[in-house]
Every structure is written in C-alpha cells, then in structure tokens.
Amino acid sequence: MLRFQRFASTYNQRAVLRKYPVGGIIHGFQVRRAVPVPELKLTAVDLIHEQTGAEHLHIDRDDKNNVFSIAFRTLPPDATGVPHILEHTTLCGSEKYPVRDPFFKMLNKSLANFMNAMTGPDYTFFPFATTNARDFVNLRDVYLNSTLRPLLKEQDFYQEGWRLEHSEVTNPKSDIIFKGVVFNEMKGQVSNADYHFWSQFQQNIYPSLNNSGGDPQKITDLHYQDLVDFHHANYHPSNARTFTYGSFPLEDTLKKVNEEFRAYGKRIINKKLPKPLELIETKELTLEGQIDPMLPAEKQTKTSLTWKCGEPTDLYETFLLKILGNLLLDGHDSIMYKGLIESGLGHDFSVNTGVESMTAANFLTVGIQGSQNVEEFKSKVFDLFKEFIENDVDSNKVDAIIHQLELSKKDQKADFGLQILYSILPGWTNGIDPIEGLEFDELIGRLKSDFKENGTKIFKNILDKYIIDQPYFHFTMKGSEEFSSKLAAEESTKLDKKLKELDETDRKAIFERGLLLEAAQNHKEDLSCLPTLGVADISRKVDTYDLNTNANITVRNTATNGISYIRGKKLINDMIPLELYPFLSLFAASLTHLGTKTTPYGAIDNEIKLHTGGISTNISVNADPTTLQPNLYFDMSGFSLNEKSDYIFNFLKTILMETDFSTHKDKLKVLINSIASSNTSHIADSGHTVARSFASGHLSTVAAIQEHISGVEHYKLISRLCSIMNDDKLFQSEVIDKLVMLQRIIVNSQNMEFFASVDCQAQENKIRKEVDYFVSTLPNTSSDISGAIQTACVPRYSDSQVLNLIKFPFQVHYTAQAYNGVSYTHKDGAALQVLANMLTFKHLHKEIREKGGAYGGGATFSALSGIFSYYSYRDPNPLASIQTFEKSASYVLNDAKWTQSDLDESKLSIFQQVDAPISPKSEGSTFFNLGVTDEMRQVRREQLLDTSLLDIHRVAERYILPNKSIATVVGPGIDGETVSPKWHIEDIKV
C-alpha cells in the first residue's frame, strides 16, 4: 500500500509538470522553469511575458483558497509618501470601472476571504484570496484594470493624500487645515514609538531608501502631477510581477493578463539597487522620539548596534545569518537575552533587533528598550559576542532551530498561499530567485551537513567576517515629553507658511474645491459596471465536522500532516477574587517566562523548542451564546509531531506546578516592563479596539471582565507595578503573593476539558491516555482561598460615564460608541450584524473616512458579547465622529434609501469571514472555544441569509435609536472640550 502511495504521488507530480513544459508558450508567457517542491506539496512555475518582460510565478497546489497578486517595484523618490498615496488612489476608479473606490465597493460584492493593497519599503502589491472561481475572475479583472489603467483623478489625490480645506467644509470663515486619509494615517503611525524608532532607523541605515509610507511633515509637499508621473514610471508590465497560487487553472489567468499587457511594449527598467549607509567607520546618531507613558522616565531610551552582513542574493549565507541571529537573540536561553534583558540592562529588545534583509543588504542588529546606560549596553554587546566565539554552540540549540523549521513546514495554515507571497516578494522585486527561497529542504540539509562537519565554526566565520572589529551603526532614540508638541508645532508652522502664500483667489478655490469634493462624496453612483456575486452563491448549510467526545476530551480526526494539536481549558468561574482579576493575564504570561526553583526558563524553553512547536497559556472570557452570562477560562495549548505529544503534557505540568515566582522576581520585573511597552504599542496600533472595549465595559459584564484582564484596568495595574519595582517588600506583597495565590487557585484537576486534532485513530487513543495521566498528576482538591466571588458580580463601569477620554500622547484619536444588543441565539442578532455591516459600507466609510479624513471607521456587532458599537481609527476629529455615530440610527430610519441589492451585498461581505477557509487544527473547535453548537450556527446562518430590510429598520429603531450609549476617545485631550465633569478622564501612565 505504501509503495502504491509513493507511486501515486510521483505520478501526480509528473502530471503537474506535463502541464508546464519548459520553453512552452501559454498566452504570451514562456515557461522558464517548473520546479517541484515536494516538502511543501507544490510545484513552482516561473514564466516571463515575451512582449513586456513581466514575470509571473505560479504555485500549483491542491488548495481551494486561491491567491492572485500584481506587484510593482516602487522605489520612493523622497519622503512624500508617493508610493503609498498612489496605492490608495490607484484603487479609486479605473477606465473599465469608473466609480469612486471600486476596491472598497468590491469588498461587499465578493466572497473573498482576503483583499488588500500594501506598500512595502520598495514595492507595492495588490493581493486577494478566494475559494470561488467566478469571484477570482471578477477580482482579478478589477485589480488588473485598477493598477494599469486608473483614472487618478485630482479629486481623489486630495481625498486620499492631502489637501487644504476648511474645518467646516460649508463655512468659508472656519479655519483652513490639513486633511487627507494617508496624511492622518501616517500621523497615527508616528504616534507609535516603536514605528517611529524603526522608520528613523531605516531612514538612517539606508538613507538612499526613502520612507515609502510618507513622513507627515513631507506629505504636504507632494503635488498631484508627481503622483501621475510616478504611476507612469512604475506601474508598467515591464516592472510588474504577477503571482497565482492554488488549484484554479493557470491558463485562464495568463490569458487575461496577456490581454491587459499586450497594449504595452517592453521598457528598460532600471534594476540598480539603492545602497545602504556606507560603514567605512563606525557611525553614531541620537534622536528624540515619542515617550512611552506606561514606563518611568529613566526607561525611555531605545538603543541599537547594527552591522552590514553581506547581501540577500547569497541565499545560504543569508540563511546561516538568520540561524546565527536565532542563536544569539531568540528565546530565554539565548546569550543576548540573558546578558541584556535578564540582566536588567533593558526590559526588552528594540523593534529593529534581529536579522533583516533590506533591498540590497543584510543587517544584524542588537538593541534594547529601556536603556539607562548606553555605553554599558554597547560594551556588554561586545563582551557577549566575544563569549559566544570562545564557546561552542550547544548542538541541541541548533537541533531545536531545525526542528522548529521542519515543524513549521508541516503546520498547515489556511492562508498558506498568502504566506508564500509575503515571504518571496521582497526579494523577488529586487532580483532574488523566488523559487530558491521555497526550497527549504535543500537549505536545511546543507546546514545539517555543514554543522556536522564544521560545528560552531560556521557561525564564528560570519561573526569574524562581518561583526568582530568591523564598523557599525549605533542608533539611539531618547523619549521626550515634548515630542508630540514639537510635531504639532512643526505642522502648524508649515500650515501657516502655506496659508500666507494664499491670495483671495486661492482661498476661494480651496473653499469651492471642498464643496465639490463633498458633493462627489455624497453623490450616489451607478455601480452596475462592477462584477458581483449573489446571495445565491452562498450555501444555506453550515460546514460540520465529525467529533469524538468522551468524558473531558473531544477529538477531531483530520489531515494534520503528522502533527497533534492540543488545547485545554479550565473553567475558573466563582474562583477568583475581584482584586486578582487584573493579575490574571500577568499570571498566564509568567508561566512561560520565569522558570522553576531548580531550572531557569531558558533551559525549559530550549527543550520545548527541541520537542514541540510551542506551549502557551492564556486567559479568556466568553459569553454564553444564549444568556450572555460570562464564562472565565484558563487556557493552555501546544502542538508537536505525533510521536512527541507526551512532551506537551510534561511541559504543561512543569510550568503549571513548578513555576516559582519568588526565585525569579527579577525576570518577573523584566516581564512587567516588557508588557507595559507592548501595551503602548498595542494602543497605538489598535486604539479603536481599546476604546470599544472600555465603552463596552460600562454595558456588559463580559466586557467588564475583559477590561479587568486585558483592558484599561490591566494597563493601570501594569503601570502601577512598574512604579513599585524598587521596593522589594511592596513588590512581594503586591505582585508575587498575588501570583502565588492565583497558582494555588487555578492549578488543580477540577473543571478541565481538552480538544485535540490528530490524523489517525492510534494517535487519538494515545492522546486520550496522555490527557488522563496529565489530569491525574494535578492536585485534585480545590483552593482554600476564601472570598471568591461570582463572575457575574464583577462591577461594570458607571453607565453615567457617557463620555470617556483615555489620555495618550498621540497625534490623532481613536473613538468608539457602544450600545447593548442581544445574544448569539436571539432572533434579532443576525439583523444587528447586517445593520452594522450596511452602516459601515453604505454610510460610515463616506462620513468618517472620505469626509472626516480618518484612516478608518465603521460599525460592528459582536454576536458573542451582545454589544453593538461604532468606531473610528486614526481620526483627526473624534467629536465629529461621535456626532455621526449618534445620528446614524436616525439616518437609517429616515434618510437611507437602501435597496435589496445593498442588503445582499452586506450579506456577501459578512459571509466572507463566516465561510473563510480554516486550517485542519481549527476544524470543529467552535463549540469547545465558544460554546456555539452546530445547530446554533445553522440557525444563525439561515437568519443572516433571511434578514430583510424591514428587519434592519426594526432593530435600528429598537436597539440603537432609543438606547443609552457610552462613548470613549483614546488620544490627547481636546482643549475646551474633553474636560470634567462632562468627560470622565482616564490617564494611564506611571
């Protein structure tokens, strides 16, 4: 039987290769190579368009989630953000689809599970993924026509890029200010301290590679004609790389691409790569940056050392460099982590730490956040390199890295095609063979034999060649309290300068242009030119999966490729005293950071990597899908090769029962500082979710618990803990004692359930025995902690706090407004979900983004928490957004002229995610994770499909129009507006 399977596999591979004969011509494309990559179960086909020289890579794989992308090399000429703004305006209408923003409008005319457009450092690409063949054709046509033949209207440049416009568009006496979607997006980016550090580092290590996203201070120097010229120069087939992945026929796509390309000739493209900073001698640079309000003043410095280490074109040396970076930096047992982070020199690595392949150079960077002595850091790094060279690398560490690489190949992901695209595109656009990068087995095999023959020498040679006694770039950024105000002053100065250059004719033109733009935004367009799917394309039946449930374990037997996935959860309702809720997330994180009385976590971590794909612990809270009552869980998970599944349970037992908080209090302090810094980055990136969670916490018990374990209450706790670290007695009583108490409460055998995904009956039997044994080794008695409370008694925020401000030193704001809705199984839940989607696509996108200039905005209904909410993202005018939110229900009932077609499009948009492909390990896990049965899912699906326009009006009138709402803004205070007592102010800082 095995012999037959091998023969069948070889036969299929040969059949695939016969489809792509080398030298053959397929619709104007010549096949240059067809390379089987058996370790990834795919064949890579390299083609070139004879007429234009455009390159196409096809990944032939038995995967129904098909991907298409078109990419262009787009070296930014300056820091005005022209590649980024072009990415936006390209999708604002084309010759074949002359409607405003066909890309956004296709989001609800499609069943694609992924649609986007992205700007990299020196390339721009437009990918999508779908399982529907007709959808694939529709989106492919829109993407090709939009990128090659966009309208590039000046009006779209003003909307998406930047413009001068009155703050009140219809009032010529109101202030003239800067507006624009990308302008505000990048102001939000600069507010993220990590992003600003990274972008300034990149700009200085690679001065010839400008900021493609755009510097807000430079964006307002860009002219419309610059945009048109940049498109003409770069969005040409000769400069394009197209990509397809999956099971759909390649010939159809090549035929369409050839039709689009044949109007073009071959253009000579400048393939010269910009060069990085020339490090003939060591260079140092210190700049000011954004302060981190969650860390104390003495921990506001980020600093790093960077060496140039060859070029990405040498694939094996680049691979070795990445392995070296892993040995030096990855994990608790790495020499740099122990010497720089565990030692307390920094609380975490800087965001640029690691190995980076950037255009024409590889870099190795070692950096820290929270440095109090930059010179001590630099000296320590040199000492650690010397120590690394003087000692042999433990072969187990190399084996662990190889094990992780090999396991990652077998770990099947639902978005595998997109992941391949992301991995190859940066190098492909700069002349690196994309297929060689897919051949992992060859690289790993060479590493194994090289390390066996030469040992540590292969890594020491790289250090000797590029690091030891070589010049480097020392980059430091010091957090400044005045940073945001200085940026605001610079913007004000630039605005004043532009305003002084205006005469009355200019001012009149600006006013009239604003009116014209608003009129265009309000104009209802004929969208009949856009291709669309219909509700009939959506199945009325949910996908179900056979499960084997016995006692406390449920097993899904499916194609896991020889991997066992284990998830466990423990219900901890009625166990946790209220004062310990904010400590729950810290407790879960501590288990995979500290270690035991006898073994540091670094040693445990290395064993975990050697034998498994990883172990994790977490806290989650879910609402009952019928009653909305909260269920609080301690979660644990891990995965490994089938033959090593027992290691998962051994490691879980070790970290649960033996983690010692007192022995490793210094590591605990490092972890707390790291969490504080991560919290700041999270708020800068996802402030709208923080605002939404805080607002929801006033209305829902589940949301209130979530706030305590991972929201504002948790942020406040972490900030307070950062301020007491130097007081050992206080730290013991306020932190360590509480974590020990949680360990006593949580670690026992009661209320434990498991879910396993395996690929054969024998492995299922093995897992069941391992679960039984694991549970039997845990204490079987409940905690003796007194004063436990019901989760339902967790206090919500006062609902009299209708307006809330969470103060952060950003340049833009994030807003949310929350309302009580209904449970997952309630008959009105589906209509509320459709209402939220229709408001997003048919109203709020126009009002919040196009008119208001925010980067994003919309409405959501969380069926699993029962909360309906509005939000805006990187918003220059949050108070106007709140007014828009408050008027939205009235708009639905009185002004919206929504049609059945509008309703159907919203259903398509919702089912993009409902029916998105899932990985084998996720099959059948919905009930285990959320308590939602297949029967509930089926009823919900039918309710979504059957929702009518009358239902939409009914739920808007019943749940949104009359109900009390809670609004929250994240960002800086607004003078004269966000003041007490009208506003409740939360100031999260040390």
UniProtKB/Swiss-Prot annotation:
Zn(2+) binds at H84, H88, E185. InterPro entries: Metalloenz_LuxS/M16 (IPR011249), Peptidase_M16_C (IPR007863), Peptidase_M16C_assoc (IPR013578), PreP_C (IPR055130). The active site is at E87 (proton acceptor), E160. One of its GO terms (biological process) is mitochondrial protein processing. One of its GO terms (molecular function) is zinc ion binding. Pfam families: M16C_assoc, Peptidase_M16_C, PreP_C. Its EC number is 3.4.24.-. Gene3D superfamilies: Metalloenzyme, LuxS/M16 peptidase-like (3.30.830.10). Keywords: Hydrolase, Metal-binding, Metalloprotease, Mitochondrion, Protease, Transit peptide, Zinc. Binds 1 zinc ion per subunit. Residues 1-7 form a transit peptide. It is found in: Mitochondrion intermembrane space; Mitochondrion matrix. Its cofactor is Zn(2+). GO terms for cellular component: mitochondrial intermembrane space; mitochondrial matrix. Monomer and homodimer; homodimerization is induced by binding of the substrate. Degrades mitochondrial transit peptides after their cleavage in the intermembrane space or in the matrix, and presequence peptides; clearance of these peptides is required to keep the presequence processing machinery running. Preferentially cleaves the N-terminal side of paired basic amino acid residues. Also degrades other unstructured peptides. May function as an ATP-dependent peptidase as opposed to a metalloendopeptidase. Belongs to the peptidase M16 family. PreP subfamily. This is Presequence protease, mitochondrial. It comes from Candida glabrata (strain ATCC 2001 / BCRC 20586 / JCM 3761 / NBRC 0622 / NRRL Y-65 / CBS 138) (Yeast). The gene is CYM1.
